C-alpha cells in the first residue's frame, strides 16, 4: 500500500540520519571522550553530571564556587540515584558506581585531563568569559569548552578564548 511504502521510507531515512556524522570528510574522526568536567553544581550542572555518570558511564569532575553548592548538587544526584535504586532499575552496586563517578571540587584540581568541560552557570556573559579563560589555563589545549547557555551568543563567550574554535554550545533541556 502507499501508506506502507511511506512508513518504510520514513524508517529508512531515519536510520540513515542516525548514521550521518554531519561531516563530509571521512578522514575527520571524533576524538574520544574519557572524562568530563562540569562547572556549576546547581540543578542543571548536577543533572548533567548525573546523566553523564549514569548514561555515558564517564567520570565527572563537578566544580562549584562553594561547599554548600557542591553539597546541594551531590545531594540532588544522590536523590536521583536513590529513586532509580528504589524502582529497581539499577542495583546497589551500580548505584555506588554512579555516585563514585562524580567527584566534587572547589578548584580546578582534576581538570587537567578532562576532554570536555560543560559550563552550567547562570546567564552572565562576563562570568562565562572568565570561566573560558580559567578552563584554558587549567586544562589541555584540546579540551572543548561547552557552554550550556540558552540566551547568550556563543561567539561572544568565545571572544575571551585563546582557542575560540574549542568553544561550542551544548544545550541540555532538563537533563533529568
Label the predicted regions.
Residues 38-40:
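Conserved N-terminal Rossmann-fold NAD(P)-binding element of oxidoreductases
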